[in-house]
Amino acid sequence: MDSAVELSDPFDYIDHYFGYPVIGTEYSYEKLVNPSMLCEDKYFNLVGMMNYIIKNKTSDDDEKPGNSKIKSHTDQPPTTQTLSKSNYNVIFKIVIFIIIKCKRIKKKNRVNNPKIKTNNPNEEFENTGADSVVTQ
């Protein structure tokens, strides 16, 4: 992600990082309802999202009276927003929701399309459900 991009809202970050709007459009609704699309999506990267959260985490030391920092007196407030606890909770719930849905979809796909392993590790074939007959 380009470090020059300043994002004011955690959801703006998600929009920018994943390359599509996450909340508020039909496309994003489809992504949330059908998380298998997210599992296949090349932009889906939990590590990047968690790195963003860790980088922008506020520490309690900044708010203690003894640790006052020199603040610049400008007319405009800073454009980047530090994540509050409620924002952490929202992002955490979205991430957990997506992980659970992806695991369920992968498990469902394994049940519907089981593979039979042969002695040759490079060879797999799908189980069609028909019993194989061995002739001697």
UniProtKB/Swiss-Prot annotation:
Protein name, per record: Putative uncharacterized protein DDB_G0276061
Region (Disordered): 58-82, 112-136
Top-rank taxon, per record: Eukaryota
